[in-house]
A protein has these predicted regions:
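Membrane-embedded helix bundles of polyisoprenyl
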Residues: 130-148, 152-159, 186
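Short hydrophobic/aromatic helix or loop-helix immediately within or flanking a transmembrane segment
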Residues: 51, 55-59, 69-101
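Membrane-interface alpha helices of multi-pass inner-membrane proteins
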Residues: 138-141, 172-196, 289-293
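Membrane-interface transmembrane helices that cradle and orient dolichyl/undecaprenyl
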Residues: 158-171
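Transmembrane-helix signature of polytopic, membrane-embedded enzymes
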Residues: 22, 119-139
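Start-transfer (signal-anchor) and selected internal transmembrane alpha helices
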Residues: 1-35
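Transmembrane alpha-helices of multi-pass, membrane-embedded glycan-processing enzymes
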Residues: 93-96, 106-117, 151, 157, ...
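Alpha-helical transmembrane segments and terminal signal-anchor/GPI-anchor hydrophobic tails
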Residues: 51-54, 61, 67, 194-304, ...
């Protein structure tokens, strides 16, 4: 199954490059349909959290509208622990359960929302949508989103709202971010970005902030105890957990290498043009790499980094568009695609991303 997922966009990429922009849009749409099919038709065992969402969904037919936003929800049949869901996601579950009570439908609906938002985002923002799809697969974003559906919907709602910043429309931007927060509260960090992303950021800012974050992250365990004494218990527990996973640190390091490689292939003039034309990409890169740097000593920083990390699938194609020499650009794309593919194979040998392997269709479970 995974070989099909990887080979299919690669074939469509060749088609799109030969036939032009319109064919690339068709190729993107076809790829998204295939991605939706495998995401929607997976069994409850594909993705660690999938079974939890299915279990919760089955409780909504018994929940009244009056209790919709206050009812306790249990992600396991034994009801040994409780999961507090945001109001927007509760409303989605309730409306869907009225007409489609079968358990698989929540997976289908989550997948449809994720892929529809992905399609809208890539069509609007990516100059090379098929390369973005390749990175979406090989950087593990696709499989991660199978595991954390609420987060994925919230993040993509945030990304698709960024065009309001370019148009300087505060009200629709805030409304869309509040919609994202109604699916996952972590999306609240997108609210202040309206005033941050369009400042005149330079690549030296990215470098300095990432280096400073790495130093702070490495030193953080030394002062974690003092931080705990200054914060309430709930916050102290969140900000003092220091057993960072090596996987997230390695992912951050690989992201930094990809960005550095593309910058290395660009001339100084091309880099300056990128700085002046795409401050949004620079800021989001700085945010992601800095949070991965903090993750050296602060495990909770990885969750925040996950909000900005997926932006790389659009950032890299946009960076490549500033390379003026067609041969140099094509060679950089090829090296980038090969590096991402090799990284994916090695990562799958070491770690099962989001508990999504082995894959199984729901009707075969």
């Amino acid at each position: 199954m995974l070989c099909l997922l990887l080979a299919y966009p690669a074939r469509l990429c060749v088609l799109a490059r030969r036939q032009g922009r319109s064919a690339q849009r068709v190729a993107l749409a076809m790829s998204c349909v295939v991605l939706w099919f495998f995401m929607a038709m997976r069994a409850q065992t594909v993705g660690v959290d999938t079974k939890y969402y299915v279990c919760i969904y089955q409780q909504f037919p018994q929940i009244s509208w009056k209790e919709l936003f206050t009812a306790q929800l249990y992600p396991t049949p034994r009801r040994t622990w409780e999961l507090d869901l945001e109001p927007g996601y509760r409303l989605l579950n309730k409306l869907l359960s009225i007409y489609l009570p079968a358990p698989q439908w929540i997976t289908v609906a989550n997948s449809a929302l994720i892929i529809a938002l992905l399609y809208r985002w890539l069509r609007r923002e990516s100059p090379n949508a098929m390369l973005s799809i390749w990175l979406y697969l090989t950087l593990g974003v696709y499989q991660t989103e199978m595991n954390v559906a609420r987060n994925a919907i919230a993040i993509l709602l945030g990304y698709t709202a960024f065009h309001w910043i370019k148009e300087r429309k505060l009200a629709p931007y805030f409304l869309q971010i509040l919609m994202a927060v109604s699916f996952h509260k972590s999306a609240v960090v997108f609210l202040p970005l309206y005033w941050l992303v369009n400042r005149r950021w330079k690549y030296r800012h990215v470098l300095y902030c990432t280096m400073a974050a790495c130093i702070l992250g490495a030193a953080y365990p030394v002062v974690a105890g003092r931080v705990a004494n200054l914060l309430p218990y709930a916050l102290a527990k969140y900000f003092t957990k220091s057993n960072s996973r090596m996987e997230s640190i390695a992912v951050g390091a690989f992201y930094a290498l990809l960005v550095a490689f593309v910058l290395y292939k660009m001339t100084p003039e091309e880099c300056k043009k990128l700085e002046s034309k795409d401050p949004q990409g620079l800021f989001l890169t700085m945010a992601a790499l800095s949070l991965y740097g903090l993750n050296l000593g602060l495990a909770s920083a990885a969750r925040m980094a996950a909000l900005f990390g997926p932006y790389l699938i659009v950032l890299l194609p946009r960076m490549l568009e500033y390379i003026n020499c067609p041969r140099r650009r094509a060679a950089t794309i090829q090296w980038l695609a090969v590096a991402a593919g090799l990284q994916y194979v090695l990562r799958m040998l070491i770690n099962n991303i989001g508990g999504t392997m082995p894959y199984q269709f729901f009707w075969a479970a």
